[in-house]
Amino acid sequence: MKLKYADENLISRVVKIWLITGLVMVFMQIVIGGITRLTGSGLSITRWEIVTGSIPPLNEAQWQSEFELYQQTPQYHKINQGMSLSEFKFIYFWEYFHRLWARLMGLVFIFPFLWFLWRGMLSRRLVPRLLVVVALAGLEGFFGWIMVASGLIQRPWVNAYNLTLHLTMEIGRAHV
């Protein structure tokens, strides 16, 4: 009987560490998103490729191709015309890091969630909340792309309402 109690404590502690790690990652994503916004980097990646977008440009030809796509955006024409490739790499880094961190958060959340669920390590009360977190994460990524797309058409900036929704969903996810 004592062993079972010890196992329950261990399970509870492991789940708590996982949830706290998720909260810290959400906070870091908000900080990274703020840096991305303040550096004007959010429109530097003009495509939304969930899997292949995980790999940054690896050679000069790929960098030049990404830069040429950016040069077609309103932000480049109205604000950053004449930007060098090295300046582009700086803003690209922040948007790339923002997206990469989001993908990492997804992996850090979904695999342990499925493992804990399969092993019966999550309380019945916690499972619906965590499913809401999964749904919010997917919606947030979708709204993030809508936000970026809003700045690639006519304006050199993103729609403020979309930005607010994107940030609010991130904060809301931390409170579920």
Regions found by a protein language model. Give the residues of each.
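C-terminal ends of transmembrane alpha-helices
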Residues: V31-R37, G138-R155
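Individual transmembrane alpha-helix segments
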Residues: L69-L107
